[in-house]
């Protein structure tokens, strides 16, 4: 490895004019450039810097205290909690149906996956079977949000390495998909689309055709992004062999999702423990070999192709039918029944005021979210509110491993490594 150089190419381990080669100068020593010198010598080889939380590369929610030897990271400590809202406790103070808006604020880039994960946990506890059409709609919207999440990561990662064009292309594609989701569920970001027993709304007329047309455009944009980055010398040099994690280390550190698969472990919950209709769909699980930042980028690119494939199959297989269970102990009755019958009024009143009565018990349910395994541990005492709710955030193990992934690497390697794990503050800090 070449020797690390400080600012201006000066070797911080032997700076002229310091208190001695490699020694820390006395407190208060001022270093000034001499006549004819462009840079002042660095006063010490050791430096501790604060990166974030206001630094744009830290996405506003994470502080990293980094100890450097020249430009080499010797140690890093993470300071989190800037986005903590008390998610779990908040959910224990509302009815089961009122939890969904809180889940929207976990991974806010792919919120429908959070909705679906919580709904599946409650349905598993209540032993509730949902209609087939609702299953397909959940998969379609989840995979659309998976593409949006990966587009955001690829665009932000490229932008923070200097490729602004890629970011703009990614945001264009993401906005096209978000517009379709807004037409379906009324919101681009915080969707609140899933319901216990089904989904909130069916597809509006012409929505399938418009979505397929948008997917064609997204495919073209994604291919153009690949052409810009896959053989880009600068992007490859910044990402290849940086932030490496072996398969064994990834498993020991608790990695799941694209970061685990990039390290060579072919584990995907959609295949390992299929839910909804994933067992009826034909799609592949991409697996990396190097476990570095470039593999994690390639993993997202290939997963977008597989999500596109899944969505198109769902449109082909989905048949007309109900979108939510017709059991008014769990689902609100339709408005004609509420306005026209006393039974409908009573069912509506009890669900809104008291909440769904979920049978007493506890369950852990897990799904394959954009960043890995999203798990909900739910405890019910038979009342209308969760007695206890615990969340397994997929991004936390990767964030906790960041000091291990970056130790001994250059400070500049921290940026693509942080981007490639896709730490979302909403889900990690809850």
Swiss-Prot record:
<protein>
    <recommendedName>
        <fullName>NADH-quinone oxidoreductase subunit D 1</fullName>
        <ecNumber>7.1.1.-</ecNumber>
    </recommendedName>
</protein>
<keyword id="KW-0472">Membrane</keyword>
<feature type="region of interest" description="Disordered">
    <location>
        <begin position="1"/>
        <end position="36"/>
    </location>
</feature>
<comment type="subunit">
    <text>NDH-1 is composed of 14 different subunits. Subunits NuoB, C, D, E, F, and G constitute the peripheral sector of the complex.</text>
</comment>
<keyword id="KW-0813">Transport</keyword>
<dbReference type="InterPro" id="IPR029014">
    <property type="entry name" value="NiFe-Hase_large"/>
</dbReference>
<keyword id="KW-1278">Translocase</keyword>
<dbReference type="InterPro" id="IPR001135">
    <property type="entry name" value="NADH_Q_OxRdtase_suD"/>
</dbReference>
<dbReference type="GO" id="GO:0005886">
    <property type="term" value="C:plasma membrane"/>
</dbReference>
<dbReference type="Pfam" id="PF00346">
    <property type="entry name" value="Complex1_49kDa"/>
</dbReference>
<comment type="similarity">
    <text>Belongs to the complex I 49 kDa subunit family.</text>
</comment>
<comment type="function">
    <text>NDH-1 shuttles electrons from NADH, via FMN and iron-sulfur (Fe-S) centers, to quinones in the respiratory chain. The immediate electron acceptor for the enzyme in this species is believed to be ubiquinone. Couples the redox reaction to proton translocation (for every two electrons transferred, four hydrogen ions are translocated across the cytoplasmic membrane), and thus conserves the redox energy in a proton gradient.</text>
</comment>
<dbReference type="InterPro" id="IPR022885">
    <property type="entry name" value="NDH1_su_D/H"/>
</dbReference>
<dbReference type="GO" id="GO:0048038">
    <property type="term" value="F:quinone binding"/>
</dbReference>
<keyword id="KW-0830">Ubiquinone</keyword>
<keyword id="KW-1003">Cell membrane</keyword>
<dbReference type="GO" id="GO:0051287">
    <property type="term" value="F:NAD binding"/>
</dbReference>
<keyword id="KW-0520">NAD</keyword>
<keyword id="KW-0997">Cell inner membrane</keyword>
<dbReference type="GO" id="GO:0050136">
    <property type="term" value="F:NADH:ubiquinone reductase (non-electrogenic) activity"/>
</dbReference>
<keyword id="KW-0874">Quinone</keyword>
